[in-house]
């Protein structure tokens, strides 16, 4: 005997209200892989955390290297986050890293290998993100999300290097990045439950 739920759906607000943490800065997520994958992921994450929030003020701070150079530090630390807050007049900062490992190119035997060839590849990826309060330098929230997906437009170079440099990142990496971002940003978004 099957039971069918007929209860109505009720909206549950985000677990974290970002208006309580404004003004917010976001440092472009670090990524070991060269190319557009990490900046694309940062942009998608920013869009996702804003989606179900009221108007929130977010400042794009640039890359970690640029931010550290501006504040005179060599790594992100408690003191560095406090300096970021003072320099940019921010209450909280998002920082993260996109780790891509085990790139498995899909190369057919009919292709002749040449340096600079673009192929699709299956990759394992993990997105790690934290939100840090600048006054104390303490982490308020953190998460990680992992996925394995096939992506396109991976350039291969002599010596085994890979570059994620698609002209259209949404088409090439969208499935992977959307999964990682949706999973990592869930605490900032509306959810639904049945009553």
Language-model-derived ranges and their functions:
Residues 6-20, 87-88, 100-103, 119-195:
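C-terminal/domain-edge helix-coil "capping" segments
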Residues 30, 34, 69, 113-114, ...:
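Residue-level detector of alpha-helix boundaries and kinks
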């Amino acid at each position: 005997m099957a039971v069918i739920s007929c209860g109505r759906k009720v909206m549950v607000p985000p677990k974290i209200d970002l208006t309580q943490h404004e003004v917010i800065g976001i440092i472009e997520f670090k990524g070991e892989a060269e190319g557009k994958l990490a900046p694309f992921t940062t942009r998608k994450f920013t869009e996702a955390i804003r989606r179900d929030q009221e108007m929130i003020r977010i400042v794009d701070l640039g890359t970690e290297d640029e931010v550290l150079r501006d504040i005179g530090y060599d790594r992100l630390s408690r003191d560095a986050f406090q300096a970021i807050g003072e320099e940019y007049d921010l209450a909280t900062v998002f920082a993260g890293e996109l780790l891509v490992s085990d790139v498995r190119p899909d190369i057919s035997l009919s292709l002749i290998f040449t340096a600079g060839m673009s192929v699709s590849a299956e990759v394992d990826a993990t997105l790690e993100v934290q939100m840090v309060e600048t006054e104390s330098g303490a982490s308020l929230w953190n998460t990680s999300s992992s996925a394995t997906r096939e992506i396109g437009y991976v350039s291969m170079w002599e010596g085994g290097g890979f570059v994620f440099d698609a002209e259209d990142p949404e088409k090439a990496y969208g499935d992977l990045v959307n999964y990682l971002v949706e999973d990592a940003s869930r605490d900032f978004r509306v959810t639904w439950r049945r009553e």
